[in-house]
Amino acid sequence: MQLVAYGAQDTFLTGNPKVTFFQAVYKRHTNFAMENIEQTVNGTPANSGRLSVTVARNGDLIADMYVELSAKSSLVATTNGDSQCWVAERAIKDVELSIGGQRIDKTYQKWFRLYSELYLSEAKKANWGKMTTGKGTVYLPLIFFFNRNPGLALPLIALQYHEVRLDFDLTDEFATYFNTSTFKVWGNYIYLDTEERRRFSQKGHEYLIEQVQHTGSDTVTSNGTKQIRLSYNHPVKELVWCFNNGGSTGSNMWNFSSNVGATDVILNCDVTDLGANCYVPITAGTGAPLLTAGPDGGSLRWVEDGVAPTDGAVGPLSTFKLVLNGQDRFKEQAGKYFNQVQPYNHHTGTPYPGIYSYSFALEPESHQPTGTCNFSRIDNAQVSVTMKRADTSETMHMFATNYNVLRIQSGMGGLAFSN
């Protein structure tokens, strides 16, 4: 009956069909191999130390990379385990990628947390948590453009005259959390077959890459609305920001709520006893850290919406809007819009309260451009920020992700567009 119940409307769905669901098709790919190889690290790990890695030419291309660390055995491993949760993110203040001495991109400490909350699915977020949490060996994935997309793997074979370098600035608490004898960097190398290897080495390349811009942090006072000037360049896909003023001890490092420095906002690596007191999604991935509020079943809630401090730890942002050349880019919106509606429309992840984003792109996580705002052509970009609490000041950390073009020609590489 279903097959013969066919009318004019069905022609829009099945007329002149181009595909069948009952015969699998596939595409043949070029021959390749991969191998993970440890890099040589120059320098000695220490508080506020600086380490460098010149990427070895062990393969034709290099893709994903990881930092291996040894967290101290004295870190807390029980419920409310502040010091071991996401501990790998405590190691690096920032890491800079350069090619031939030119800075290509830079990743900042807070960007690791914002990236994992917004860009990762709940399953990957749990695995990220387990990778970066614990005593002993922990891993921190690098998240430059070539680490996240194999189609953007850096062609070392085409960079005969320029070296690829990573410079790591360590935090001033490195020795508190990590054994200074261990700081390893691993790179996943791609080996191409003969014909493709020849093409990569002889022709020029143009890669559409993604960069992260961060021009510093701004203090937002408690009285009234503050206008903050944005000094960004290039076609920007998205703005991402958070507020933090509680230092780096324990869960304060990741506490972006209105309850600054609150001991009631805790990091928890024990998922067995959170059900009655969880206002953010939890997973069954044992060992993945979670930020929660109200230890031991207390009354404190941790949600984005609400009035601080009456409702406990809430998202600190009251209202926000973007102003370009004196014109409102959109109508002023509440913090909940940027914490929940924007990520719902444009992101894979569900960020916890206090993390905000605004996307100019339909799909900011995609390499394919789906919308930008060219800040190089904007004379005056500002944001208007109003906080919920009248008795505290907060520090705003804002980041912009943008497109640029990496050109590789005649054995050398560099950016097509500078700042």
Where on the chain are the PLM-derived regions?
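Short, low-complexity Pro/Thr/Gly
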Residues: 1-419
